[in-house]
């Protein structure tokens, strides 16, 4: 998961570079990238749109999840209560988003299994 700001874009790209080094050594490591999930998303800002376009122009573009976790104060409230937002506020936007992301990632896992 990553927020969509300039530092996160750089950091995610650097992390992927390190992971890809391991991916090129299949005899020693079995590692794959399942996806890049965007969190704390606010689609209404020019900054978000600019950074999303920048991310789409990176090597990570193929891994970007369709589901995004929307910005919400409910996430902080649940964290302060030490309870996952999906349990604390199951009908909130973040809960809906996290459940959709889970379904998307499970579908990717199944697709990978079928492709093997």
Language model: regions and residue ranges:
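Anionic-ligand binding region
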Residues: 9-34
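C-terminal alpha-helix
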Residues: 100-112
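C-terminal boundary of histidine-terminating zinc-finger modules
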Residues: 78-97
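Inter-motif core of Ras-like GTPase G domains
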Residues: 1-6
């Amino acid at each position: 998961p990553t927020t969509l700001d300039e530092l996160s874009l750089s950091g995610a790209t650097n992390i992927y570079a390190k992971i890809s080094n391991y991916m090129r050594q299949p005899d020693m490591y079995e590692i794959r990238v399942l996806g890049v999930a965007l969190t704390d998303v606010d689609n209404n800002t020019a900054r978000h749109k600019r950074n999303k376009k920048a991310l789409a122009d990176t090597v990570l573009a193929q891994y970007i999840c369709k589901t995004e976790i929307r910005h919400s104060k409910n996430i902080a409230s649940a964290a302060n209560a030490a309870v996952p937002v999906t349990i604390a506020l199951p009908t909130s936007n973040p809960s809906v988003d996290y459940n959709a992301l889970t379904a998307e990632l499970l579908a990717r896992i199944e697709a990978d299994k079928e492709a093997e």
